[in-house]
């Protein structure tokens, strides 16, 4: 497997994380360095770590992971998306505020769950990398760096989109996450 193929693989794996990062960007009034570091670190780190775990676990759990990865990703993304929708419905409620949600969309626990949900496919890729004769270290680093960069770009794109459309885009972010969960589920159930 040459570097061009590895780069294409990395781009494909990064798409889910980029979409989730864009959804996170919708939910903040301004992007801070902390947000960029969290998004790039969690998503890039998880995408790089999962192939390593997949490679280490190898064929022992490969068939089990592939049989359930889409369900796991769907449940995690639907849960986080549903939580965003629930929090968004409370905007402008009892506190008489400006419509800010109480939860931090960049809380470590939320970022961890989202990073795992968007990187489960990378676990399966890690199992297959040796079969593809791909240089392992180069593949893992490329997957992590590409995901980190695209996720950071997605965060800014989501913020820009949110700035143009106004404050109530937590709803859109929740819908995006739930939609992404359905997309992953349908790809595996229908296209497999």
From Swiss-Prot:
Protein localization:
Cell inner membrane
Write the record's keywords in alphabetical order, separated by commas: Cell inner membrane, Cell membrane, Ion transport, Manganese, Membrane, Transmembrane, Transmembrane helix, Transport
Q: Which residues cross the membrane?
A: 3-23, 36-56, 65-85, 112-132, 136-156, 171-191
Q: Name one GO cellular component term.
A: plasma membrane
As for membrane topology, the entry says: Multi-pass membrane protein
- InterPro entries of this UniProt entry? Mntp/YtaF (IPR003810), Put_MntP (IPR022929)
Q: What is its main location?
A: membrane
Q: Does the keyword Membrane apply?
A: yes
Example GO molecular function: manganese ion transmembrane transporter activity
Similarity comment: family membership = Belongs to the MntP (TC 9.B.29) family.
Q: What does this protein do?
A: Probably functions as a manganese efflux pump.
Q: What is this protein called?
A: Putative manganese efflux pump MntP
Give the source species. Answer: Sorangium cellulosum (strain So ce56) (Polyangium cellulosum (strain So ce56))
């Amino acid at each position: 497997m040459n570097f061009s193929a590895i780069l294409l693989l990395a781009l494909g794996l990064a798409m889910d994380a980029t979409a989730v990062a864009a959804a996170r960007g919708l939910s903040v009034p301004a992007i801070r360095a902390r947000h960029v570091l969290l998004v790039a670190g969690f998503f890039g780190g998880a995408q790089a770590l999962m192939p390593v775990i997949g490679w280490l676990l190898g064929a022992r759990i490969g068939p089990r992971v592939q049989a359930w990865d889409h369900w796991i990703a769907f449940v995690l993304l639907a849960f986080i998306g549903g939580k965003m929708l629930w929090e968004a419905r409370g905007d402008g409620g009892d506190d008489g505020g400006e419509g800010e949600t109480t939860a931090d969309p960049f809380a470590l626990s939320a970022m961890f769950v989202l990073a795992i949900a968007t990187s489960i496919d990378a676990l399966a890729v890690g199992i297959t990398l040796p079969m593809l004769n791909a240089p392992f270290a180069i593949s893992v680093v490329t997957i992590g760096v590409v995901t980190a960069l695209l996720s950071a770009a997605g965060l800014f794109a989501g913020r820009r989109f949110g700035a143009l459309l106004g404050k109530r885009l937590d709803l859109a972010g929740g819908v995006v996450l739930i939609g992404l969960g359905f997309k992953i589920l349908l790809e595996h159930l229908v296209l497999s």
